[in-house]
């Protein structure tokens, strides 16, 4: 993998946040199926993520044969991320990190939120340890080109809980594996980007 530019990092993390922050609408799904993201998928393939891109594209292709496919994907999203902790893979660090690590973890996270003057959307009460908060912090760190903190966030604050989160994601039974493929891509991108 070639090192990402600042703009590429920002785009990738915005895309991942959009993919994992809420279910795709019918119009968003149609955009993927019509090929509007083919250039982005080609970029990811060139970066060495061919298997993951093919998996995502295969799921999108299969959904073309499903009536009301966006509702099927919404059901998968709900099953994966929104039910209780025994049924779903909740996208929160506090679910996967040991209790002893939480204070230090949240102190680091809160310092970054303050640094970038990020406030959580009070209309939708989300805890600060939601996966999309981390993705936004990565985007912000890429924007200011603070690669030391960027790598620290990935290695010390994100991957330690993202790996067990992915284990749970892969065990949840859904009709498609679309979101499972996206989570694997996220982890591989983080691991590869941290090594460059």
Swiss-Prot record:
Pfam families: Nitrate_red_del. One of its GO terms (biological process) is protein folding. Gene3D superfamilies: 1.20.120.1820, HscB, C-terminal domain (1.20.1280.20). The keyword Cytoplasm applies. Involved in the biogenesis of TorA. Acts on TorA before the insertion of the molybdenum cofactor and, as a result, probably favors a conformation of the apoenzyme that is competent for acquiring the cofactor. Belongs to the TorD/DmsD family. TorD subfamily. This is Chaperone protein TorD. It comes from Pasteurella multocida (strain Pm70). The lineage of its organism: Bacteria, Pseudomonadati, Pseudomonadota, Gammaproteobacteria, Pasteurellales.
